[in-house]
């Protein structure tokens, strides 16, 4: 047997993404549990909004049972804006009564390179002021984070992904940066950064 694919209205989808999620190969004995595992793996990639595996009725003389995978991809690009307010008082605030407001934006791409890679970047900024003593702005904060997630295990665990029946597998690289100014605490600038490489798998 062979694996073929036909795409309509989708210009950026790597065929390797489909073959990587298959839990069976042409010529294998029929096993419904492997079909179910394949559908779960396709759903777990986050690329598709609809997945279905349908069996084709074979000829009476044909011992093979062909299957068709019907997939519908999600909208690739998403942008979200957010606003928020916060109020602090007592030991956690720079003044007796501090009120702050902020703005944030998030961009997401569920299929960055065509292989199911999920990219997300988020940035927020906020300002706080003394509303009790009318002392003006008391603090400012800026935070940004970015992550890139693969729907499979990368080096050095890629072989484990290929030779085991995992319900879901994911590798993620993430970065975060934070900078803040606190006038009342005599801190003119505070910065913090972090990086993380994480593997997730479910059997």
Language model regions located:
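Second-shell loop/turn segments in exported
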Residues: 3-8, 20-29, 134
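Gram-negative/organellar outer-membrane beta-barrel architecture
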Residues: 11-12, 31-203
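N-terminal export/assembly leaders
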Residues: 14-19
């Amino acid at each position: 047997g062979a694996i073929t694919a036909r795409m309509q209205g989708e210009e950026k989808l790597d065929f390797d993404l489909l073959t990587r999620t298959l839990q069976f190969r042409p010529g294998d004995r029929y096993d419904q549990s492997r079909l179910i595992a394949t559908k779960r793996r396709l759903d777990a990639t986050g690329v598709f909004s609809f997945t279905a595996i349908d069996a084709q009725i074979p000829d009476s003389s044909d011992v093979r049972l062909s299957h068709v995978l019907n997939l519908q991809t999600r909208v690739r690009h998403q942008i979200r804006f957010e606003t928020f307010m916060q109020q602090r008082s007592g030991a956690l605030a720079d003044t007796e009564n501090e009120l702050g407001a902020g703005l944030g934006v998030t961009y997401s791409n569920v299929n960055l390179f065509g292989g199911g890679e999920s990219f997300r970047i988020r940035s927020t900024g906020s300002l706080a002021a003394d509303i009790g003593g009318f002392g003006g702005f008391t603090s400012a904060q800026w935070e940004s984070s970015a992550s890139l997630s693969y729907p499979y295990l990368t080096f050095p665990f890629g072989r484990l992904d290929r030779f085991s029946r995992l319900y879901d597998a994911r590798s993620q690289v993430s970065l975060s940066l934070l900078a803040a100014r606190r006038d009342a605490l005599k801190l003119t600038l505070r910065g913090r950064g972090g990086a993380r490489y994480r593997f997730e798998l479910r059997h």
